[in-house]
Amino acid sequence: MSGAPPSYSFVALPPRAKDGLVVFGKNSARPRDEVQEVVYFPAVDHDAESKVECTYISIDQVPRTHAIVISRPAWLWGAEMGANEHGVCIANEAINAREPAAETEALLGMDLVRLGLERGTTAKEALDIIVSLLDEHGQGGNYYEDAHSCHSFQSAYLLVDRDEAWVLETVGKYWAAERITEGVRCICNHLSLATKLDEEHPELRTYAQSQGWWTGDDEFNFAQVFSPADDRLDCCAGQDSLEKQEESITVQTMINILRDKASGVCIDSESFLTTASIVSVLPQNRSSPCIHYFTGTPDPSRSIFKPFIFVDDVKLVPKAQSPCFGDDDPAKKEPRFQEKPDRRHELYKAHEWARAVIESDEEQGRTLRKTMLELEKQGLEAMDEILSSPEPPDPAEVGDLFYDCVDTEMKFFK
């Protein structure tokens, strides 16, 4: 088992967020060569007693799944981060804990992100669904597309809706959760929940005592009890990035935080890279739509955040989706990952050209980046107009919003 790469998920709620908005963001730090895709799945009614095939195992399907949009490593079923039609956003962090994560194939933390989005109408309902599935099926299996080594982790989640956020941290089937109703919060690759636990597994403390990790005499501190002895519990650079913001936090603020390499929030190392990013704005006024911005490409400092709004007729974006290999996918065969197919989608390939220009040609790179940021700015301003309008947007005008943004970006790269 290797250490989890530095990865950060954020939320800002009023009064720290601007104009009665909840702002959510995440950088997904993954192996450098891994491709993430952005995929929309409509709401679906399912047959009774049907199954859903997750990354490694199949579980019982529910009668109806909600419409979702997710950013995910292209080889797996679940999601690193995403949102659903009810304004629920979930992000996952891989964490190391005192108890090693199981290598036995079960549900991945990323599967639980997607399952929570497909089945939950609020952040709390999604949390309840995740811990129920965790208890029934467990978590385990390889987090990376790697035939030579199994990289298994415990999982933490940030679950957000228009009203509140929840931090959920899990160790095996055991878990603890904290409700956040105001201010800012960041989670990273370390257990962060301390003594304020709003909900927990009914046997959490008994289990800790049985392992000799807690005597029962002193106050129960979840992170101290379940973290490895050498873990630094105070090293979440992302929390500092949020707390030092003097102005109200906006979508642009969150984007700037995600692009910050100096703080370590945007990772670009020999082994790992921020392979995709998301920012969502959830208005507490329910007459305004939630807006979700995805990059679909690596390194947010060299990517464009493109908006998505849920409507009944969303136009699919195949240019941001990886090739499908069906049952021949090496991730679905056992032994797994014996081959590594080319999972790059069209947007990813176009973005590779842009990255090469930025890295190799200083003048052309500056010009290219300036134009990219201008394109992004136009999108942000158009979305601000939608949020400030007393009327909901015309579904016909926003159903192809993400499609048009991807198309414009690719034409520009060409």
Swiss-Prot record:
GO terms for biological process: exocytosis; proteolysis; regulation of synaptic vesicle cycle. It comes from the Eukaryota. Keywords: Cytoplasm, Exocytosis. One of its GO terms (cellular component) is cytoplasm. One of its GO terms (molecular function) is cysteine-type exopeptidase activity. It is found in: Cytoplasm. Its main location: cytoplasm. Belongs to the peptidase C69 family. Secernin subfamily. 'Secern' is an archaic English term meaning 'secrete'. Regulates exocytosis in mast cells. Increases both the extent of secretion and the sensitivity of mast cells to stimulation with calcium. This is Secernin-1. It comes from Mus musculus (Mouse).
